[in-house]
UniProtKB/Swiss-Prot annotation:
This is Bone morphogenetic protein 8B. Homodimer; disulfide-linked. Keywords: Chondrogenesis, Cytokine, Developmental protein, Differentiation, Disulfide bond, Glycoprotein, Growth factor, Osteogenesis, Secreted, Signal. The keyword ATP-binding does not apply. The lineage of its organism: Eukaryota, Metazoa, Chordata, Craniata, Vertebrata. Disulfide bonds join C301-C367, C330-C399, C334-C401. Residues 1-19 form the signal peptide. Induces cartilage and bone formation. May be the osteoinductive factor responsible for the phenomenon of epithelial osteogenesis. Plays a role in calcium regulation and bone homeostasis. The keyword Membrane does not apply.
Length: 402
């Protein structure tokens, strides 16, 4: 019996067909050597989107040819992806402390930028706004950061600067807007690099009012309280190179599993067990000089290759990484006696014994995953925000008899 992780079991044959055509990839034995038709491909795409927790295929806007250099948010998220992908042990510590227990990370690019730095009007400030409509409902925010790049200031020599961040709570027509303090960082005017401000406290408002974000406002002051134009302090905005533009990154603790829409499932035809009065021969332990075939050339329960190709699905216009991943599946015989290499449960051993006595009443034990791990997918949403999602129980790590 074949077992795939989670709801992927219905897609096994289709994915073999999709993944078998890539360079250097060999489909597992028994996979159909054909390409899917248009309708079948759409069905497979819809199923995988549901597994990934997406209601539909994202359609990001292609950037102009002149601005296709790497942008700051995707570069940062790609670093996070590699950190998360390196931590494939569900029980291990995360590769990066800032990831914490988050399994969903979203970045938001600066959509609107306002300045008050003209003439001698004070205080000076810079305001940023973001498209937060894609924030998922029902997710808990574990952290949120505003990242802005700073170059050395030639106007302030090496003075100490205080950079403060506020959330705009309510705009007023006849006075200053109502603000909520978020974070304060102290640095030197000659410093260079990414400045990170904690804006987690604003996340509750984002979750409640996705369509009414009034933005974040940044102030810079000297030690004596004099207001400084953020641009003169070396803080870059929308006019900066794409790799140095400001953005917000938010960490979520996602739901344990995506909510999948019900669909029609074709009933599987169950094969009738062959009647035999002969006891099966003992399975051989796989060793260096022999294969993993049991008696009569049948394979014992083990893990097989199953590659899911995002490239063959035509999704590389929105999936940043990876181009595909190995999901694997479990298949093979669980015949008595069950060797230690089969990772059999006590129940599987008992079921195998009863099957010997009553083969028509009790089926054999099943070959199924005994250990699953997560895989991470980095992609653009339809608003060109970059999303990093960790999907649990997507990769078979070990198989056994159940």
């Amino acid at each position: 019996m074949t077992a795939l992780p989670g709801p992927l079991w219905l897609l096994g044959l289709a994915l073999c067909a999709l993944g078998g055509g890539g360079p250097g990839l060999r489909p597992p034995p028994g996979c159909p050597q054909r390409r899917l038709g248009a309708r079948e491909r759409r069905d497979v795409q819809r199923e995988i989107l549901a597994v990934l927790g997406l209601p539909g295929r994202p359609r990001p806007r292609a950037p102009p040819a002149a601005s296709r250099l790497p942008a700051s948010a995707p570069l940062f998220m790609l670093d996070l992806y590699h950190a998360m992908a390196g931590d494939d042990d569900e029980d291990g510590a995360p590769a990066e402390r800032r990831l914490g227990r988050a399994d969903l990370v979203m970045s938001f690019v600066n959509m609107v930028e306002r300045d008050r730095a003209l003439g001698h009007q004070e205080p000076h400030w810079k305001e940023f706004r973001f498209d937060l409509t894609q924030i998922p409902a029902g997710e808990a925010v574990t952290a949120a950061e505003f990242r802005i790049y700073k170059v050395p200031s030639i106007h302030l020599l090496n003075r100490t600067l205080h950079v403060s961040m506020f959330q705009v709570v309510q705009e007023q027509s006849n006075r200053e807007s109502d603000l909520f303090f978020l974070d304060l960082q102290t640095l030197r005017a000659g410093d260079e690099g990414w400045l990170v401000l904690d804006v987690t406290a604003a996340s509750d408002c984002w979750l409640l009012k996705r369509h009414k974000d009034l933005g974040l406002r940044l102030y810079v002051e000297t030690e004596d309280g004099h207001s400084v134009d953020p641009g003169l302090a070396g803080l870059l905005g929308q006019r900066a190179p794409r790799s140095q533009q400001p953005f917000v990154v938010t960490f979520f603790r996602a739901s344990p599993s995506p909510i999948r829409t019900p669909r029609a499932v074709r009933p599987l035809r169950r094969r009738q067990p062959k009647k035999s009065n002969e006891l099966p021969q003992a399975n051989r332990l796989p060793g260096i000089f022999d294969d993993v075939h049991g008696s009569h050339g049948r394979q014992v329960c083990r893990r097989h290759e199953l590659y899911v190709s995002f490239q063959d699905l035509g999704w590389l216009d929105w999936v940043i990484a990876p181009q595909g991943y190995s999901a694997y599946y479990c298949e093979g015989e669980c015949s008595f006696p069950l060797d230690s290499c089969m990772n059999a449960t006590n129940h599987a051993i008992l079921q195998s014994l009863v099957h010997l006595m009553m083969p028509d009443a009790v089926p054999k034990a099943c070959c199924a995953p005994t250990k699953l791990s997560a895989t991470s997918v980095l992609y653009y949403d339809s608003s060109n925000n970059v999303i990093l999602r960790k999907h649990r129980n997507m990769v078979v790590k070990a198989c056994g008899c159940h």
